[in-house]
Curated annotation (Swiss-Prot):
Family (UniProt): Belongs to the frog skin active peptide (FSAP) family. Ranatuerin subfamily.
One Gene Ontology cellular component: extracellular region
Protein name from the UniProt record: Ranatuerin-2
Taxonomic lineage: Eukaryota, Metazoa, Chordata, Craniata, Vertebrata
Disulfide bonds: C23-C28
Function: Antibacterial activity against Gram-positive bacterium S.aureus (MIC=60 uM). Shows no detectable hemolytic activity towards human erythrocytes.
An individual GO BP term: defense response to bacterium
InterPro entries membership: Antimicrobial_frog_2
Locations listed in the record: Secreted
Recorded superkingdom: Eukaryota
Key word Translocase present: no
């Protein structure tokens, strides 16, 4: 349903932010 899709989108967004934060800390280069 819509709620689940929203939840998935939010989870993906958070995962992306965490990944970016990790890259800032470790200095890895995003493609």
């Amino acid at each position: 349903g819509l709620f689940l899709d929203t939840l998935k989108g939010a989870a993906k967004d958070v995962a992306g932010k965490l990944e970016g934060l990790k890259c800032k800390i470790t200095g890895c280069k995003l493609p």
